[in-house]
UniProtKB/Swiss-Prot annotation:
Belongs to the glycosyl hydrolase 13 family. GlgB subfamily. Catalyzes the formation of the alpha-1,6-glucosidic linkages in glycogen by scission of a 1,4-alpha-linked oligosaccharide from growing alpha-1,4-glucan chains and the subsequent attachment of the oligosaccharide to the alpha-1,6 position. Pathway: Glycan biosynthesis; glycogen biosynthesis. It catalyses: Transfers a segment of a (1->4)-alpha-D-glucan chain to a primary hydroxy group in a similar glucan chain. The keyword Aminoacyl-tRNA synthetase does not apply. It comes from Prochlorococcus marinus (strain MIT 9312). One of its GO terms (biological process) is glycogen biosynthetic process. This is 1,4-alpha-glucan branching enzyme GlgB. The active site is at 431 (nucleophile), 484 (proton donor). One of its GO terms (molecular function) is hydrolase activity, hydrolyzing O-glycosyl compounds. GO terms for cellular component: cytosol.
Amino acid sequence: MIETIQADWIQSEAINLENCCNDNPLKILGPHFYEEQWVIRVWMPEADEVKINFKNNTYKAESINHKWLFEAILPENPESNYEINISRGGITHTQHDPWSYIEEWMGEVDRHLFAEGNHHHIWEKMGAHLIEEKNQKGVMFCIWAPNAKSISIIGDINSWDGRHHPMQKRLGGIWELFMPTMEEGDTYKYEIRTQQGHIYEKADPYGFLHEIRPQNGSIVSKLKNFNWNDNAWITNRDSSSQINKPISVYEMHLGSWLHESTDNKYIEDNGNPRNPVPAADLKPGTRLLTYPELTEKLIPYVKDRGFTHIELMPISEHPFDGSWGYQVTGWYAPTSRFGTPNEFREFVNKCHEEGIGVILDWVPGHFPKDKHGLAFFDGCHLYEHGDSRIGEHKEWGTLIFNYSRNEVRNFLVANLVYWFEEFHIDGIRVDAVASMLYRDYLRPDGEWIPNENGGNENIEAVKFLQQANHVLFQHFPGALSIAEESTTWPMVTKPTDMGGLGFNLKWNMGWMHDMLDYFEIDPWFRQFHQNSVTFSITYNYTENFMLALSHDEVVHGKSHLLHKMPGDDWKKYANTRALLTYMWTHPGKKTIFMGMEFGQRQEWNVWDDLQWDLLEFEPHKGIRNLVDDLNALYKNEPALWKNDFDPYGFQWIDCNDKSNSVISFMRRENDTNEWLVIVANFTPNTHDSYKVGVPVEGFYKEIFNSDGSRYGGSNKGNMGGKEAINYNIHDYQNALELALPPLSVSIFKHQSKK
């Protein structure tokens, strides 16, 4: 009777294995001590014959209770490693037994930290890891999917057949399997069978490398195999706060900065050409650059321009080029479009060698519905909310993370730490923060659910952002955490222990909209809109602001920066120069999008590269020269950055000359007798003797003039500077009598003598 029960149980388990419905394969497979003897059971779909090979003995395994379940009876304890010899259709191969490795990979402490949302290095456990177990090299797979009925590893190793390698379910919804037959470079997915019997093929949420789109499998990849030489950079970065330093950021999209001819293939280190990544929407005969080519071309360009940082639009793996990277499916993998993870590491390493920081756009606010991604991951709403009123951005067609779930927060917070630790990035810009903070964001009445207090705030998202920033600065005190937050949510850049969100910079969206609205107006009408150009100072010290002219302002029919400007070409160039110069002298850190630095004419298009041929024309060279010189001046004059967030650093001289559309102000360093006087003339009218009050007498050297001939201007100016005269104006006893060029900004520095 006992043997009958045992046989029925074995047959039932075998049927479950065949139907991919077994969550505990170790219960039946691998070595077992049964009725005073050792047996090894092996599950080998479509095998004709199976043998168990030890160092000195071979045992034939017999099919029992099911044609694919084989059992070998051993005379002794199988303590040593063994191999399985499998014959299928006349072909024989040998492999190690995945189910002979029974030790748990995810320990009790790891599970506990993950379950409470505090495992900051969870990527070292989750995903696919090249390890050695019982002196055998292989890959340990580990995934969180608590609602799955069963999960299998599928890939080239088993012809993508989920019946071959079922995973073992552990405590906490963790699934594991050691695959001794797999190695670096192997492609895989998780085949997940839901409680309802549906089957999903999912890429690894923690995968370190993924296939090039349109394929979407994950690829086994080594993690810690790169030799960094930026220790001095990292030490210096984390030794003090970065926000009290000059920050000038070049925002860019790697795939549309510069393209290469398909005739010029990238040559690998081994001398072989790399096949171009397919991109049907690019111009015929062109291809994307690789990470090594970007290292060679982009970094010197950014260094020559004088920017302190590069901001990369999302490079985490994403299936659709047209999303610009903002619909992420591979959170722990740099996109394969441009090369390998180590090639991206070398890009960052080289940036640091050249004194350039690297900021990544990070998108924890939503994720796409692609079938291979996080959506409905284990047959349930695991990463997202089940109710679309709080779990979906219908306008974007994406899903919202369930921030109330500890493991989901852990996935995201650890991802933040991962990019800093494994790729040495220096900062993040969090996209669309407002969409996270408000439950009714882009939602009509009746299509959102109030929070527990009846309000529209997303309390769980607030707590997540606070946790993410707290953990980030705990690990990397010199990091930059920049919020793209478009509302008046308070205390975005205040510390979390004060109730703030914990960012250290926030894009000043109000300044950006006011400036663009103002500069699009015909200069004659600007006299009626003076408030647009001055209002930002009234709230400037409520947050740590960064002034940004971003990619969002040069797409979807908005025109690129140059073509937003009114008038003929000369006025467009002059207005552009004036806006950029005013931006560099206004309190706040700086960010501009690629192409603005030389006057790109066409709107940004993700499929096209920049109009580099424009640099053959002097006006465009002039704008680039202006940006170069502004960055150099900015870094050399502490008054332009040292007190960005302190009212002491800025003082109006006159902001009320509406009829002339002229403003003047001072930028000051700490307790020094040197300061800068900035005078802006936002009309095409020239003023030959415009008086501006100054605090003390002395010589004021003209250190910058956006109308200079080097920049394509008319070269009107003040012959190198002006001596202050005794004249009472703007509440000062001294004044400068200046020539103000048309559509220009001039900068003067006080000196004790000429």
